[in-house]
Amino acid sequence: MEKLTILLLVAAVLMSTQAMFQGGGEKRPKDKIKFLSKRKTNAESWWEGECLGWSNGCTQPSDCCSNNCKGRNCDIW
């Protein structure tokens, strides 16, 4: 029984090292992580202060929750 336990532990270590080498052992770039992560709705982004609601001042479309910057203010949608 002890030999079986040791054999299973050795197999687990070998498999984990093999997986590490096949994967390159590197962390994924942040771009890939952002792409694979859950995207927030416009309301969630606004609630957490990550974007501006309508009629707020903006300089570029990404400032607005609606991604619509008309003139100097965020448009509704």
Curated annotation (Swiss-Prot):
Keywords: Cleavage on pair of basic residues, Disulfide bond, Ion channel impairing toxin, Knottin, Secreted, Signal, Toxin. One of its GO terms (molecular function) is ion channel inhibitor activity. Residues 20-37 form a propeptide. InterPro entries: Conotoxin (IPR004214). The keyword Signal applies. Disulfide bonds join C51-C65, C58-C69, C64-C74. It is found in: Secreted. Coiled coil: none annotated. GO terms for cellular component: extracellular region. Its main location: secreted. Residues 1-19 form the signal peptide. The keyword Transmembrane helix does not apply. Expressed by the venom duct. Inhibits voltage-gated ion channels. Belongs to the conotoxin O2 superfamily. The presence of a 'disulfide through disulfide knot' structurally defines this protein as a knottin. The cysteine framework is VI/VII (C-C-CC-C-C). This is Conotoxin Vc6.14. It comes from Conus victoriae.
